[in-house]
Amino acid sequence: MRRALIFLASPHFFAPNFFIFIYAKRISTPQIPLFIRPQGFFQTNPKVASQLYATVQQWVKILPINHLWDLFCGVGGFGLHCAKALQDQGKPVTLTGIEISAAAIESATQSAQKLALNNVTFASLDAAQFALKDRQQTPELVIVNPPRRGIGKDLAEFLNQLNIPYLIYSSCNAESMVKDFAYLTHYQLHRVQLFDMFPHTTHYETVTLLIRK
């Protein structure tokens, strides 16, 4: 059984530093607190989002990785779930989360502190520009959850060149995802799962695991 609770109201109702707190309790996954501010991004369906994060967490925890990037990270849902699972296994984990929204980064940092995660950094930057410029340490896994437009040709080709063993790609727009897959020529699709994130609409969330050829 998975549960999530969220309270929403007009942003004008809240004091500047007020935050909304989501507590998602899940069987077989750690308890991950996620904080949302009015201008931060979070999945529109918290119940399905908890299943989405738990699925990726299960995929990642068996991979031989220690260093990961979470690009377009929002409030850090994907990266925090994965880092917590890996750290609980005794692995030395380094997580870098990148998101353009400063409010979302504040929330992600707060969650990391609550979880007492070490070697976790969240920064308010353009995800594509960060990836193209940061060559100091190459991760073993990159997670991308881009806007509907996708990651685009430049970032996809950069990921090809970066020689990363694993990619997690989550998208609410299968058409842009397919276009990006055409650019990701060094990777092959290994796992895929759909989530009914938007009931009673034609939209859905797709998460995939890609492995370097």
UniProtKB/Swiss-Prot annotation:
Do the record's keywords include Transferase?
yes
Q: What is its EC number?
A: 2.1.1.189
Give the Gene Ontology MF terms in alphabetical order.
rRNA (uridine-C5-)-methyltransferase activity
Q: What does the record give as the active site?
A: C172 (nucleophile)
Gene3D superfamilies given in the database record:
Vaccinia Virus protein VP39
Q: What does this protein do?
A: Catalyzes the formation of 5-methyl-uridine at position 747 (m5U747) in 23S rRNA.
This protein is called Putative 23S rRNA (uracil(747)-C(5))-methyltransferase RlmC
Identify the species of origin.
Haemophilus ducreyi (strain 35000HP / ATCC 700724)
Upper lineage ranks? Bacteria, Pseudomonadati, Pseudomonadota, Gammaproteobacteria, Pasteurellales
Which gene produces this protein? Answer: rlmC
